[in-house]
């Protein structure tokens, strides 16, 4: 089995964000110290990186499922959770990332192109990690001073992608099976491709680095083509994707073939027809030269056979009439290889300069609109507010007469994933956010009535509930005692001296009030003393005397008063 794999389907998932913490600060002499729950850590992302040391996608065939590390949950004392580590996956230079399309459980086919990793070190974030949930310390504000909940971490992005390897080479060797392409790449470079005397020996592309003086260039040996390959004959056009990145196409023609109906000119025309069929299906990268416009070079091989050399000399003028450069070589005797090497080096130098010029012109012609730098807190403000374009509400109905309202939008779907539905206060916070965004108003506009089913989100992550716009905003104890609005600690509203620190003005006022009260008591006692109430017991025992200390209609403890 070959260890070369140039197309795989990979399932990637970013790490989940950690949950926020709903901690309460506990400190001596501070019974109402407030919330101190930290935020959850963000999940790690899955990143493809072009690596010059990688040459195949074989690892992803046997391990197609890759997942990044999740973030940890927040802790008390406003300690944020740690961020999950990013998962960096090395891929060969020239790898193209496509979105995988197709029904679940069946083979996928490439969809939209997501990235083209053409240079070593290029990176693409294929699955972003989820954001960590906010702790209750971050949720506290002027009106919600003691949140009893925190937000959950968001799940990481999850998707299927297709990786296609398109070899980066300067020269592509194309030709019929057994034309000598593998022998040529082995003779000009240090590559060791499989060589045998039967067709379709080469089943995978081979790359070789050729040295011409101080210059180096790469040649690619593409598996053999036959007429009708565009309709699936032979190996089809499966491996022709490897010539998309090559700037020079070299036709290797077998001049010693004995197959009936074949000659060098007919072989060239047949291959050009297949290339034209394939070129019409391509979407070339920025600055690339279309395949029909790329320079061709004709290599007449196997001239070590006498009849083949005569045929090569005969057809050479015919190719030159078409404006093509022709080289007569033999991979067995190495005849003409040195001249071919220098000719390819000069052609590669010119094409590299041409491609660089095209890319620069394309970049200058592109209009890049850069958004203004947003303030630091813009994201949080946008997360709370919104406009009518942030979501959509549609009325849905199935064949059974079941009716529901579907709410879709980035913010509502994110908020649903962040909500802990086991916490009534968190559910109420979600209701407040949706109402502030305008979801309730839009539901009324669409004709929704209390009790109608509402679904927020798509697929398995959708949340269903019965809409009740009149739900109470405050939480309740088990006995029905109202606790107040969400996030409001009623203890903070009490005038308890232990919960409030007096100002200096209040201390002075209370001190003067206390001293005035004591002075009034002393003056009253002094007046009673001067009136003789303390010296005459009969006056003190008079229950009709309103000015005495023991009067006011009270009966003596030792005996009844005589009438």
From Swiss-Prot:
Alphabetic keyword roster: Cytoplasm, GTP-binding, Hydrolase, Magnesium, Metal-binding, Nucleotide-binding
Domain of life: Bacteria
Annotated segments matching region Disordered: 525-563
Residue ranges of domain OBG-type G in the record: 169-349
Domain Obg: 2-168
InterPro entries in the cross-refs: G_OBG, GTP-bd, GTP-bd_Obg/CgtA, GTP-bd_prot_GTP1/OBG_C_sf, GTP1-OBG_CS, GTP1_OBG_dom, GTP1_OBG_dom_sf, OBG_GTPase
Binding sites annotated in the UniProt record for Mg(2+): 182, 202
Cellular component, GO annotation: cytoplasm
UniProt entry tagged with the keyword rRNA-binding: no
Compartments (UniProt record): Cytoplasm
Molecular functions per Gene Ontology: GTP binding; GTPase activity; magnesium ion binding
Annotated positions binding GTP: 175-182, 200-204, 221-224, 301-304, 330-332
Enzyme class: hydrolase
Protein purpose: An essential GTPase which binds GTP, GDP and possibly (p)ppGpp with moderate affinity, with high nucleotide exchange rates and a fairly low GTP hydrolysis rate. Plays a role in control of the cell cycle, stress response, ribosome biogenesis and in those bacteria that undergo differentiation, in morphogenesis control.
Name listed for the protein in its UniProt record: GTPase Obg
Organism: Bifidobacterium adolescentis (strain ATCC 15703 / DSM 20083 / NCTC 11814 / E194a)
């Amino acid at each position: 089995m070959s260890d070369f794999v140039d197309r795989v389907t990979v399932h990637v998932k970013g790490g989940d964000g950690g949950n926020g913490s709903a901690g309460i600060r506990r400190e001596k002499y501070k019974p109402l110290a407030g919330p101190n729950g930290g935020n959850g850590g963000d999940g790690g992302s899955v990143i493809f990186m072009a690596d010059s040391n990688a040459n195949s996608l074989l690892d992803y065939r046997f391990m197609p499922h890759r997942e990044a590390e999740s973030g940890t949950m927040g802790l008390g004392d406003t300690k944020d959770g740690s961020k999950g580590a990013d998962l960096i996956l090395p891929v060969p230079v020239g790898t193209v990332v496509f979105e995988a399309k197709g029904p679940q459980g069946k083979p996928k086919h490439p969809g939209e192109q997501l990235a083209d990793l053409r240079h070593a070190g290029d990176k693409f974030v294929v699955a972003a990690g989820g954001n960590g949930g906010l702790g209750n310390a971050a949720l506290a504000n002027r009106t919600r001073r003691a949140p009893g909940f925190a937000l959950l971490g968001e799940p990481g992005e999850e998707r299927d992608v297709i990786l296609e390897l398109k070899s980066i080479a300067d020269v592509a060797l194309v030709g019929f099976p057994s034309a000598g392409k593998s022998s040529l790449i082995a003779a000009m470079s240090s590559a060791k491709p499989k060589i045998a005397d039967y067709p379709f020996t080469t089943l995978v592309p081979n790359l070789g680095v050729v040295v011409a003086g101080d210059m180096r260039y790469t040649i690619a040996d593409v598996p053999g083509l036959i007429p009708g390959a565009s309709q699936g004959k032979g190996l089809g056009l499966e491996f022709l994707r490897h010539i998309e990145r090559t700037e020079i196409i070299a036709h290797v023609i077998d001049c010693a073939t004995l197959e009936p109906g074949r000659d060098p000119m007919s072989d060239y025309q047949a291959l050009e027809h297949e290339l034209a069929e394939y070129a019409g299906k391509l979407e070339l990268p920025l600055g690339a030269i279309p395949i029909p416009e790329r320079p061709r070079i004709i290599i007449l091989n196997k001239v070590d056979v006498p009849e083949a050399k005569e045929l090569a000399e005969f057809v050479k003028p015919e190719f030159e009439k078409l404006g093509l450069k022709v080289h007569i070589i033999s991979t067995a005797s190495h005849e003409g290889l040195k001249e071919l090497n220098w000719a390819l080096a000069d052609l590669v130098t010119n094409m590299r300069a041409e491609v660089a010029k095209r890319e620069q012109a394309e970049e200058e012609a592109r209009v890049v609109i850069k958004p203004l730098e947003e303030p630091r807190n813009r994201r949080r403000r946008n997360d709370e507010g919104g406009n009518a374009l942030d979501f959509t509400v549609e009325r849905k109905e199935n064949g059974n007469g079941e009716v529901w309202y579907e709410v879709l939008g980035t913010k509502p779907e994110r908020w649903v994933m962040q909500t802990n539905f086991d916490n009534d206060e968190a559910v109420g916070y979600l209701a407040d956010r949706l109402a502030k965004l305008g979801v309730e108003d839009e539901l009324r506009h669409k004709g929704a009535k209390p009790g109608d089913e509402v679904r927020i989100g798509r697929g398995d992550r959708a949340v269903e509930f019965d809409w009740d716009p009149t739900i109470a905003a405050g939480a309740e104890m088990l006995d029905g005692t109202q606790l107040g609005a969400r996030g409001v600690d009623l203890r903070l509203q009490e005038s308890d001296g232990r919960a409030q620190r007096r100002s200096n003005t209040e201390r002075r006022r209370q001190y003067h009030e206390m001293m005035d009260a004591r002075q009034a008591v002393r003056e009253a006692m002094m007046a009673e003393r001067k009136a003789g109430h303390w010296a005459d017991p009969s006056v003190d025992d008079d229950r009709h005397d309103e000015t005495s200390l023991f009067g006011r209609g009270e009966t003596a403890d030792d005996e009844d008063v005589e009438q």
